[in-house]
Amino acid sequence: MLLLTGLFFGKDCFAQHERPIAFPGAEGFGKYAVGGRGGKTLVVSNLNDDGPGSFRQAAQQKSKRIIVFAVAGTIHLESPLQIEGNVTIAGHSAPGDGICIADHPVRLKGDQIILRYLRFRMGDKYQSQKGMVDGSGGDDALSGSKNNQLIIDHCSMSWSTDEVMSVYGGDSTTLQWNVIAEPLNYSYHFETGDKDWENHGYGGIWGGAHLSAHHNLFAHCISRNPRFNGTRLGAKEELVDFQNNVVYNWQNKAIYGGEFGKYNIVNNYFKPGPSTKPSAAGNFLDPSKTDALPYGQYFVNGNMIEGNQMVNRDNMMGVTAIPGPGVYINQPHAVIDLVKENADMAYQSIIKKVGASLQRDAVDERIIREMLSGKGKIIDVQGGFPHGTAYEKSKTAWPELKASASLSDKDADGMPDEWERDNGLNPKDFSDAAIVKLHPYFTNIEVYLNSLLK
């Protein structure tokens, strides 16, 4: 086992920061999220929807906590799940192939939330039950509204009936290294006035008073890659730093929205695909306004559309022309610095590391292959089946996630006994997980979890 010291993560992880960061590699406005630091460790020991040892029971508690996994596999929810704040959920602690949440939407409530290395692949099992009534199929695979101090890192989301992942209206948020892919387009989304199910394969609505988004991959979404929320829905201000992301195979629009907000759109890589309409292939940004809210302010620089030299030389050729001054600005909005890459470098980094990549599942591997080869399509049902396919047939879309042997952890504090002994901790003392001993500010359980990703 690896013996750790306070210098294991390198001085860059703490000496150069005035405040403790969420974990090594956390960047942007959400990097100071505390999550469940200092709270109790809760161990998920089964894949049941509810009950002792279930993910639901751990997620719905309101006390400060760190959630780890002693199992791997897919958790098939029987109802929507709400994750309460003051929590760190360490998907990378699962043995073997990791964790997936399926069948119902997951919503974030409250502040101080850290999510890492999880999969949210909802699907359409319960989406048709309401019939053609307003609100049917209005679910994101993962969503959060008005959450403060939130960071979502290396997660993989897909198969929604509204947006894949929407996060807006909060403050101090980072979305980094996530896969947002394959919303279900012609599924069971219905709103008042519709005559049929809507085509609603959208990526996400993103925004907040301060939000950083970097090294995320959008794939096979017809639009909202993302839609910037702007100062709508009660938001008084919005500042989004959108850098080093990849958008592949949009259909109608890549990025749009942003009413009366402030945006940096820098060094992103856009790759049209088989579903991209020719009229949309040369445009990566379409700002929005309403009668009450004017256009936002956009700093646009260093973005690339694959194969479009005109846009790559001059980004103003890839955005919707807006008459009048003040919409496209010459200097970036002030933000927390990120580790910067140019668009080509970001594309290569995303290929290697995006999503729940400690053990990539077959879905993410396929999406990466499709992006590289210029293939894939907008889908209506998980697995690419036709609309109306019975769930019992389409459930084969969820890959089998196999568990490896769990290491002995007799005190159930989330740290293996051998690791505790090797690092001077007591494998019979549950309380030492929450103590700061092995690092200047990470608790012992955090040091262990961070060591899994070295």
Write out the residue ranges for each language-model feature.
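Extracellular calcium-associated, cysteine-rich motifs in secreted modular proteins
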Residues: 392-454
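Right-handed parallel beta-helix
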Residues: 76-207
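Acidic Gly/Asp/Thr-rich repetitive segments characteristic of extracellular carbohydrate-active
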Residues: 22-67, 432
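Detector for repetitive beta-architecture
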Residues: 41, 52, 64-66, 72-74, ...
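Bacterial Sec-dependent N-terminal signal peptides
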Residues: 1-16
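Extracellular beta-rich repeat passengers
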Residues: 227-232, 236-391
